[in-house]
């Protein structure tokens, strides 16, 4: 734990969010030094506390532990008038209020932005919605399906697949954190708060990037291509003697260098492969020409040889291998936090590295209502 104040030291966040998108956003704020108070339902708490297996050795959901460090927890029933009043006091003391309930839940408790801003004009509120501003449910899986992401994920001619992690939720959380920081910058300049809104459908469409642009600018509806890139070749999974590796040849110079490593100079001089656009057009012929040579050595050998020549390539790692690689290249990818009970929890380190105000890991993911009494005491006049 660093004694250096974080960039958001002194910032107070009332966090009514649960599951992933909101908790990712508030964990980022907490890593940067904010005091985040997580509001949970008495008894059951955040939905993800019940999501398992796997569980930690202490029986806590690994899912929950992954996105809830650097937070304190207060247990409040928003349908109970006294608890709702406590929630309002907490919110009016905060700089930021964040939630991802269905529309109307916060308003019924008197916690919506319009109600709160009548008492705190400088308050920043953030709402993470589902598929737009309506009442559609906000689940990542639905967003991936309905937002087009699954239509471009999977093998050509095969079934559509979701990404292997709730990526839309993660990205929505990142956008929420960015929006909150932008709103705070405006507040610091003008004294005026505002409402920040992020929804899963817009987040999914934004994440489509070049695939969305293919439709918007060229009228091309993208489809599934497995691990291939629609506009670059070879930029895909190749098969060596013992399994796959990936290569990302981004320009013609790299392609010529690749041909040199593979001892296939004739491919570099072949008009079908001389330019990237030609290689995309003649992808199947190119892959057929590469296949016999690639079968002569292992994936690790090819990655070593190609990498030494400056050609972007890599192994297809499992998660444990990915963390091992991070250690090998000098990254501190694991952040260990110690709870008041002395239990150590390993979490994924924040990828932000700030030279003057580094991220810190001060608090382990809390138990349900672990800090209720202390927080109530802070709210007492």
Placement of each model-derived feature along the sequence:
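N-terminal helix-loop segment corresponding to the beta1-alpha1 unit
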Residues: 1-179, 183-189, 338, 367, ...
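Terminal low-complexity tails and localization/encapsulation signals of metabolic enzymes
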Residues: 1-12, 223, 239, 321-381
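Glycine-rich beta-alpha junction loops
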Residues: 43, 130-132, 200-205, 242-244, ...
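Conserved Rossmann-fold dehydrogenase catalytic segment
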Residues: 133, 157-165, 188-204, 223-230, ...
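Flexible glycine/proline-enriched surface loops and loop-helix/loop-strand junctions
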Residues: 159-167, 239-243, 357-360
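Oxidoreductase and adenylate-handling cofactor-binding alpha/beta cores
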Residues: 173-193, 207-218, 259-266
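Aromatic-enriched alpha-helical interface/lid elements that frame and gate functional surfaces
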Residues: 228, 233-309, 313
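Conserved PLP cofactor-binding pocket of PLP-dependent enzymes
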Residues: 307-328
